[in-house]
Amino acid sequence: MMTLSSMPVTHRADAKSGHSFDANRHWAASLTLGFCAQNSGDTRVTRMNIARHYGPLRVQRPFYPEGKDGCCHVYLLHPPGGVVSGDALNIDISLTKGAHSLITTPAANKLYKADSNGVAWSQTTNLKVDDNATLEWLPQETLAFDGSRGVQVFNIELAKTAKCLGWEILGLGRPASDLPFATGCIEQRFKLTQDGKPLWLERQNLDPTHPRFNGKWGQGGATVHGTFWTVGLSDPTAAIAALREQLPPSNNWAATYRRDVLLVRYLGHERNQVWKLFEQVRNILRPLLSGHQATIPRIWLT
């Protein structure tokens, strides 16, 4: 039986969340989504059977642009439009056996400058995918304003036969307005496990005052960073070959495959360049991963 709920989620942090603007300011928000595959006549349909929120995190109703028995598209909404000092956002998404969901956002996420107390923000995303389920995590880019301070944590937990592809794109500063990311610090942590085994563990500190930020041996002064991951390919060698054959050659991207994880990395200065690149990567890899051609979420066209 499907149980769809929009009731707020209760967290221990709730009691500490409120209208405080000093060094202890804390504004909590959370969103919990669950997807399951259900029989509908002679087909299997992915339904969103859990939807709970606390604070300003919401979700629109599911869309099925690929047909009733196709991938379930869902748009995450954060009405404030950005993250400020003291914000603590937590997103939990889980897919049970056989489900197929695509999660995206309607606009770029913004990480604003820290307040006068230097209070940091936090974002935690937990993705859990069961056997024979497929999750596509495709948010629009994140833009970090100069002086922003915070931590982004991504935890991806896959069952043995689960499949997952996704990306994260981060733009630093506002170069078009001559406002570089010159102060502040953003820490990113990635953890991907499958069947309980760690496959990809990563931590990077984006500190513009550290030599690594501009050094050729580090980030090389890149203002746009992108990571595309894929797990569950039946023929990764063919996938790598297809990427290298079909993607335009550039010093800004590279592809690797280790421990069952295919990664495409981008370091550069153009949001549109990485977006176009990652769309091409998805167009190549999605059919190999799921057997279905890539479709563009309608929200990207508005």
Swiss-Prot record:
Keywords: Chaperone, Cytoplasm, Nickel insertion
Protein location: Cytoplasm
One Gene Ontology molecular-function label: nickel cation binding
Keyword Nuclease: no
Superkingdom of the organism of origin: Bacteria
Membrane-crossing segments per the record: none
Pfam family, one: UreD
Keyword Cytoplasm: yes
A GO cellular-component term linked to this record: cytoplasm
Major localization listed first in the record, in broad terms: cytoplasm
Family the UniProt entry places it in: Belongs to the UreD family.
Its biological purpose: Required for maturation of urease via the functional incorporation of the urease nickel metallocenter.
Subunit details: UreD, UreF and UreG form a complex that acts as a GTP-hydrolysis-dependent molecular chaperone, activating the urease apoprotein by helping to assemble the nickel containing metallocenter of UreC. The UreE protein probably delivers the nickel.
Protein name, per record: Urease accessory protein UreD
